[in-house]
Amino acid sequence: MRIGIKKKPVGRIIYELTAVFALDSAGGGMVVNSLIALWLAQRFDFTLGRIGLVLGLMSLASAASALLSPMLSARFGMVETMALTHAPANVLLIAAAFAPNPQLAVLCLAGRSLLSQLDVPPRVAFVMSLVQPEERSATAAFTNLPRSIATASTPWLGGWLLTKSSFGWPLVIGGSLKLVYDAMLWIRFRKFSTRA
């Protein structure tokens, strides 16, 4: 691996993780806040004020997860925390698309926000645990660049889908991609998991 990872098996694991992380990010690009705002306006006729309130609630729920993540990682392991908290978040994201009323949709989105970021601290810690200290900066850059590109590559599709229908197709497709990420992460990487 050219980023400076000395152990070849670890280099391969980093490549695989990077690809799996990019899949998750592609799903995330389908449900950026601007597209969720557009969907809420189209589907439930939310005003800008209500949309702002919902997005604020989602952000607060997401911030709360930062406090829970280290405790879960220490108890269950990093990969377990990543996959097993992220999967229910994505089920809630998909469920929001099918919500028959705005209250249930907002409840699903808030629940999703509470769970969806629990994977971030253990993801970073897990990747860093695989490499030598002097390799961490390069590894972080290597794993984050494809994630950023993947996130940037899918909002257009979410927007296009919303021009065709007020149904939450971006939520369903984005959530489904993220569920595939969760399954791949669990199947392929749980044997490497450690407690943080």
Locations of regions flagged by a protein language model:
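Loop-to-transmembrane helix entry/capping segments in MFS-fold secondary transporters
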Residues: 48-49, 133-143
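Juxtamembrane intracellular "pre-TM" segments in multi-pass secondary transporters
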Residues: 1-25, 42
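Intracellular juxtamembrane helix-capping segments at the cytosolic ends
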Residues: 118-131
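Structural signature of the two symmetry-related core transmembrane helices
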Residues: 80-95, 175
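Helix-to-loop junctions at the C-terminal end of transmembrane segments
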Residues: 65-78, 162-163
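Short amphipathic helix-loop junctions that connect adjacent transmembrane helices
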Residues: 34-51
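Transmembrane alpha-helix termini and helix-breaking/packing motifs in multi-pass membrane transporters
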Residues: 38, 42-43, 153-172
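Helix-loop junctions at membrane interfaces in 12-TM secondary transporters
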Residues: 97-109
